[in-house]
Amino acid sequence: VSAGVLIAVLAGCSTGEPGEAQPVPSTGSTTSESVKPTTSKPARPKELKVDGIDPCATFTAAQRSELKINETSTKPLDVLTNDKPVPTCRNRADGDTMSSYNVSLISGVGIDHWEGGSNLDVVAKTVAGFAAYQYKLAGTSEAYCSYAVDVADKQQLVVQFFPIGDGFTQDQMCQNAAKGAELALATLQTLK
């Protein structure tokens, strides 16, 4: 089903222009740990409830400009691949190469969802002090990279970075997903 989400995002999109991919600069507040996802997670710095928040409000105008986002749309996506679409904002970026930052705000399911067996490569991370999992489709380095961030009990912020066309390495995709998660977390702390 993850491939289905990817196909839905990529359908009808192509760059039409060659270009060099540029990763979004990192501020260095994303860290990685070489641990299995079932290892205990660090305590979150604060609780950020996402109930009722518009996922398109998670990037400010300045952040959208920084990420080169020029188009946003809201559409529920089955991010958890459980046949239960969640509120998602698709943020299309038209930089040197096209991409999409999909931001989903999930209530009722915590990041422990990503700890079970699946067709995903899952790595424990920390984003701005919040426990997170970086995940991507197992066995590929060309599809996407996502971060699921523990924002409250049974709630998570998921930021997926999808390239539209060629031009991004797996590391660049994951750097961009981490940067998107970091920016969305900063904005979430100002909402509600």
Q: Over which residues does each language-model region extend?
A:
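N-terminal low-complexity, Pro/Thr/Ser-rich intrinsically disordered segments
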Residues: 28-55
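Extracellular/mature segments of secreted proteins
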Residues: 21, 62-67, 96-100, 153, ...
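Short, low-complexity, disordered segments immediately C-terminal to signal peptides
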Residues: 1-6, 11-37
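Sequence contexts marking disulfide-bonded cysteines in secreted/extracellular proteins
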Residues: 14, 55-57, 88-90, 144-146, ...
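Amphipathic alpha-helical segments
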Residues: 54-72
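Short, solvent-exposed recognition patches
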Residues: 66, 70-134
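A short, solvent-exposed beta-edge/loop patch
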Residues: 44, 120-192
